[in-house]
């Protein structure tokens, strides 16, 4: 995403959607706010910009550029992620179950606010 700013600013965000979801781009973005005891700091430039957008606003997106692919195997896969870092994991998991109709075991675990969550066997 490119913020409308006198100086061009670029940020890398991971796509959260998978190809079967159609002609759209889904991103997981957390607005970067200053810590409570450091409110004099500026909020995140790009995340604040994204959260200020309204339906119909135009943005520029390029990519994808990453090399994070699903291994073509029948072995169990374990996904571990946290926060906005769950975006590419969501893409993989939805692709596995909605496109490939996988039957392999794919446990996924995520961390939010320092607490680990996942399947009961964890």
Regions found by a protein language model. Name each.
Residues 52-59, 67:
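Well-ordered alpha/beta subsegment
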Residues 19, 70-72, 100:
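Short, flexible hinge/linker loops that cap or flank conserved catalytic cores
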Residues 74-75, 95-105:
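Conserved S-adenosyl-L-methionine
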């Amino acid at each position: 995403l490119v913020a409308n700013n006198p100086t061009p600013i670029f940020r890398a965000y991971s796509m959260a959607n998978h190809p079967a979801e159609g002609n759209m781009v889904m991103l997981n973005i957390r607005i970067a706010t200053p810590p409570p005891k450091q409110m004099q700091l500026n909020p995140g430039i790009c995340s604040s910009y994204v959260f200020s957008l309204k339906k119909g606003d135009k943005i520029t997106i390029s990519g994808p550029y990453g090399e994070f692919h699903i291994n073509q195997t029948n072995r169990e896969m374990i996904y571990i992620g946290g926060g906005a870092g769950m975006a590419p994991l969501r893409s993989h998991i939805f692709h596995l179950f909605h496109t490939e109709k996988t039957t392999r075991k794919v446990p996924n675990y995520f961390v939010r606010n320092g607490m680990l969550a996942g399947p009961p066997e964890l």
